[in-house]
Structures are given as structure tokens and as C-alpha cells.
Amino acid sequence: MSERMQYIRNFCIIAHIDHGKSTLADRLIEKTGFLSERETDKQILDNLELERERGITIKLKPVRMIYKAKDGNEYELNLIDTPGHVDFTYEVSRSIAACEGALLVVDATQGIEAQTLANVYMALEHDLEIVPVINKIDLPSANPEHVKKEIEDVIGIDAEDALLTSAKEGIGIEEVLEAIVNRIPPPKGDENKPLKALIFDSFYDNYKGAISFVRVVDGIVKPGMRIKMFSTGKVFEVTEVGMFRPNLYPVEELKAGEVGYIAASIKNVKDTRVGDTITDADNPADFPLPGYKEVVPMVFCGIYPADGQDYENLKEALEKLQLNDASLVFEPDTSAALGFGFRCGFLGLLHMEIVQERLEREYNLNLVTTAPSVIYKVYKTNGEVLDLDNPTKMPPPTQIDHIEEPIVEATIMVPTEYVGAVMELCQDRRGAYLGMEYLEQTRVLLKYEMPLNEIIYDFFDALKSRTRGYASFDYELKGYKESNLVKLDILINGELVDALSMIVHKDKAYEKARKIVEKLKENIPRHLFEIPIQAAIGSKIIARETVKALRKNVLAKCYGGDVTRKKKLLEKQKEGKKRMRQVGSVEIPQEAFMSILKLDDEK
């Protein structure tokens, strides 16, 4: 190992939302002199406006700091930021793979949460040295001793010498830097071997093209070299390499053990895939770094412009977002009810919400979205297998042998008094109980196997409202399982509205259908003729509501008189309404679509 590498430390910070990760990062950067005090109020690493607002980290931003330690040497510290949310699990695993150590930041007032657990286990799998940091000790309700014990009990790492800090007040920051230097091992690697570099993120720059954030494992990379991507085999010529001081700062070369960026006029972010290995095209390494996998979208939904003329703008906006977000997939889609739009695939619910919010905010678009759906495997009677991401493409029931749906293993951490409510919720959502363990007297870890279909809707909101926000939740895909699923169609005035079709479990179909038709009845305005709203499975109608017609009082002119006269007028009116119903078209307002997405909120 070279002399130079002994002075490099690559680390990440693992923390639950709001446990103070970004603030701690700011303090470390400030302490090593890269920022003036003035710049420190704004969280350096969270670039997107949305990130700051929701207090979550979505796009990663690494940063390099130079720290003069107490032993008199200067160390290069590379902080690789990790997104904390479950949708971005794969991105987290790649960030973790680029490090040798991790700071585990736990809030002194709250203790460990489910997402932290998932990420810590991932870090332990990658053999990272974990340094526990107990943050927010300045708060009156802080209980650091209790949290230390919890870290030892739950994760099983020694928390005796956990560091006590308050990032907000700047307490204990020096100790954290010393611990990074003394407890986290230097990187291993050999700069004389062929180049191997792990891509842990990428973003798109209008001038330089797609820029890959890399951790160089072996070898050296410098401008003018030809590099090859392992997963696609494409070759590019390096135009610039550099470090992060949070902003891009070009250097002459990146060597083994270092973290930096590579620009090679790559036109598309899809060519710099997270987790891929970059090697020297002229002297390639024999095999790539382990752990690369294609990112597969889990949740799909249709996105349509509320105003049909915005279609081109929506397309452009999605293309721009895709430049920076290779995990977003979309294809054109048409719906009889909503016109032209796109079928988009996302990593998870949060990802979907963020993309929708960014489209509405940054591109001023007014959107209609359909209910989210997952990918089902449909086994047909002729032996074909379909991957179904859109309920409207489901084959007729006679051609289906059976359907499988994706299953996840959910880990829920919850205070003991809410266990009953959470278990009830999971059972409600077709969850299969796997086990529970008490982490301490007051908190329980529940494990359930659940269909992804039941989670993507609003499970997280329901969980939060039943536990007053105290539960935390994480899930991991387990595979596919056969299930009794049917396609629920909604007919309005006898016509199928494709955008409202959904795939549901047979046992829940009736209840769901009832709710939908009632909701639509409230949201569709009365017309001059009556409108039947029906829910059907195949050709069998299982629920119906009718929106009554607006009608004139045709008997107003009749004073007394014969009953046959009245009958004649009423019959005539009825005839007219019937004819009108045959030719009339029903206007379905946007609210009607939106109301169906929010069906379960009222419980």
C-alpha cells in the first residue's frame, strides 16, 4: 500500500430522516475550513429545493475535505452522502461500497429507526468500520446512555466510545474528525494495476455531458485516456477528472483510493450506470467490481397533461428529468378518457411523488395521474408469461391461468402501545405475519410479508396516522407469489373508462368497487340525463350507483285534469331523456380521477 493512501479516508453518514445528517456534514466541512461561517446556514449537500423542503437527501453530493489531525499529518477525507429513503436502497448500497467506514448518526432523543437499521446492515455486509455518533445532545430530552444501549442491543456493535455531538451547536465535531482518522481504515488498492473505478452516482452537465462520480479502486485515470464501461462495453475518452470541493474542481489525475468525478463527453446518463465499473479500454481489468445490478422500476403510473396542448412540454420535462435520473423510465401512452400522456416507472412511491412534484414545480405543468400499479406476472393458458405494468393491457379472464404479484418483506419499528393498530393494518393489507422482537421495553420490531400492491398506495400514510407518526418502515423485495387477482373495470354511462381500471385482490374487489362508485357519484356533476356508474369484473357488474338527471317539471302547466294527460307528458320526457342518454357524452372532471387515488384516506 502506498504512502499516499494512508492519508485518505472515505466515509459515509448513515442516519434516519431528521437525525441531523446534513447539519453534521455542514459542520465537518466548516471545521476543515472549506466554507466560511456565512455559507453554513444552507445545507451544503442538499441541492434540490425539494430536498431541503422535505428534509431528505435525494441526489448525492460527495465532498473532499483536508483535515490537519492532532498527529500533525494532513488527511484527505472524502464524505460520500447517502440518500436515506427506502426507494433508493440500491443507490445507498453503491455509496456504501465506495467507502471504508461509516458514521452512524442517531438522534439522542429518538434512538434507532427502521431505515437506519437497513442501511447499517448493508454497511456491515460491506465490512465497513462503523463509528456511532449520538447527535442532538444539547436537547433537554436527550438520553445518550439509553441510545448507546439501544445501538448495542439492536445492531450489536460496541457503542462504549460512541461520540456525543450536537451538530447544531458545533459540540464534539473535532472528536468526530479525529475518530474518522483513527478508527476508519485507509483504502486498499493498487495504482499500478489496470484501472477499476466504481460509479456511485452521476449527473448531467449541459456542457460536459454526463459526469460520473467514482471511487477509484485500482489504477489511475487521467484526461486523454480511453475508458470502457463494463455493463455496456461502450468506450469514451476522458476529457476531465477532478475532486469535489463541494463544487467540481479539475485535477490532473485520480489515483487508487481517491474519490472524484470523470467527464468523458458522455451524451446520456444511461451510459454511466450506478454500480457499474469503469476500466481502461486499452488495458482492461479482467472482471468488474461486484454488486452491479440494473435498476428496475417497481411502481408504474400514467401521467397525463390536464391540458392536452401541454403534451410536448410534458415530454420535454420528462426527458430533462431523465438526464439526471436514469432510474426514471417512461413511454408514450394514450387513454380514451385522458388523451395522450406517458406511462412512467419509478423506484418507489417517494420517487414517484418527487418526480410529479418536480414536473409541476419546475416545469409549471398541470398533471392528472392514474392510480399507481406494480408489475404483475400473468401466466396465460397457452403457456405465455406477460409482465403487466398497466391494468388496461390485461388479457380477458378466459385466457389467464394464474397471476403472480410482487411480495415484499416489511420491517416496521413501532412503540409498544401501537402494536395492535399496526398489526391490524398489516392484516388488512393482506400481510402475512413473520415475527416480532422487542428492542427494549418500549419498542417493537415487526416483520410482515406483504404484497407490494398494498403498500404503494398509501400504506405509509395509514401507518403514520395510526401511530401518530412514531412508526418507521422499510421494505425489501422478496419475489413473486401466486395470488387471486382480478381486474376491476369502471363503466360510466355504459362506457369503459380505461384510466380507472385497476387490479385488485378478489376478496377486496367488492368493497373497493363500492367505494369507487360512491366516490364517483359525488364527483361527477348531474347531466340532463341519468348516468349509471358501474364497477365490473369481466362482464359481471358488482356495484352500481346512478347520478340522477336534472329535469324540468313538465307537470307544472297541468292544473287538475286527467291522469292520462300527465302520464303522456312524463312518458314523453322519459323518451327524450332516453334518447339523450344514447347520444350524450359524460364530462368527467379531473377531481373525479384524483378522488379515487385518495380513497382510503377517509378511514
Swiss-Prot record:
SMART domains: EFG_C. GO terms for molecular function: GTP binding; GTPase activity; ribosome binding; translation elongation factor activity. GTP binds at residues 18-23, 135-138. It is an enzyme of class 3 (hydrolase). It catalyses: GTP + H2O = GDP + phosphate + H(+). Coiled coil: none annotated. It is found in: Cell membrane. It is a peripheral membrane protein. Required for accurate and efficient protein synthesis under certain stress conditions. May act as a fidelity factor of the translation reaction, by catalyzing a one-codon backward translocation of tRNAs on improperly translocated ribosomes. Back-translocation proceeds from a post-translocation (POST) complex to a pre-translocation (PRE) complex, thus giving elongation factor G a second chance to translocate the tRNAs correctly. Binds to ribosomes in a GTP-dependent manner. NCBIfam families: lepA, small_GTP. This is Elongation factor 4. The gene is lepA.
